[in-house]
Amino acid sequence: MTLERTFVAIKPDGVQRGLIAEILGRFETKGFKLVGLKQLTPSKELAEKHYGVHKDRPFFSGLVDFITSGPVVAMVWEGEGVIASARKLIGATKPLEAEPGTIRGDLAVNIGRNVIHGSDGSDTAVFEINLWFQENELVDWNPSDQAWRVE
């Protein structure tokens, strides 16, 4: 496996419910490296670009309204297989279909308030990281326990 990066965002419901530390902890415990982190209330323009693939869907305006309704914690995580692994940690989009032990399975109830977003593939990850972060906001660093994480 090769090192890759993925974009993850704690949505306004997760921030308002005080779930930031728990969600960060799940990714750190898994062994991934946090290379980008910021809290912001997304602009309508940013939200429309982020959800652009859904622009013709009936729920598009609701997605934009929700993601711009309050602060979001935007993150970039790095690690071997981090994109697929993050998707497994996050769980199914519909919380009622998410397995127990996943973030959505444990912390979310409704699809409209499903706590977290994660990139669904490598192309999406690159697009979302570049949309939400400037290159100088991402930090390359070597954790002191790196030798204990990977071979």
Curated annotation (Swiss-Prot):
> Pfam families of this UniProt entry?
NDK
Record bears the keyword Secreted: no
Q: Which cofactor does it need?
A: Mg(2+)
Annotated Gene Ontology cellular components are: cytoplasm
Provide the GO biological process annotations: CTP biosynthetic process; GTP biosynthetic process; UTP biosynthetic process
What CDD domains has UniProt attached to this entry?
NDPk_I
Residues annotated as binding ATP: 11, 59, 87, 93, 104, 114
- Indicate where this protein resides in the cell: Cytoplasm
Query: What Enzyme Commission number does this protein have?
Result: 2.7.4.6
Tell me the active site. 117 (pros-phosphohistidine intermediate)
Catalysed reactions listed for this entry: a 2'-deoxyribonucleoside 5'-diphosphate + ATP = a 2'-deoxyribonucleoside 5'-triphosphate + ADP; a ribonucleoside 5'-diphosphate + ATP = a ribonucleoside 5'-triphosphate + ADP
> What keywords does the record list, in alphabetical order?
ATP-binding, Cytoplasm, Kinase, Magnesium, Metal-binding, Nucleotide metabolism, Nucleotide-binding, Phosphoprotein, Transferase
What does the record give under GO molecular function? ATP binding; metal ion binding; nucleoside diphosphate kinase activity
Instruction: Share what the entry says about its subunit structure, partners included.
Output: Homotetramer.
The family annotation for this protein states: Belongs to the NDK family.
Provide the function of this protein: Major role in the synthesis of nucleoside triphosphates other than ATP. The ATP gamma phosphate is transferred to the NDP beta phosphate via a ping-pong mechanism, using a phosphorylated active-site intermediate.
Q: What is this protein called?
A: Nucleoside diphosphate kinase
Q: Which organism is it from?
A: Prochlorococcus marinus (strain NATL1A)
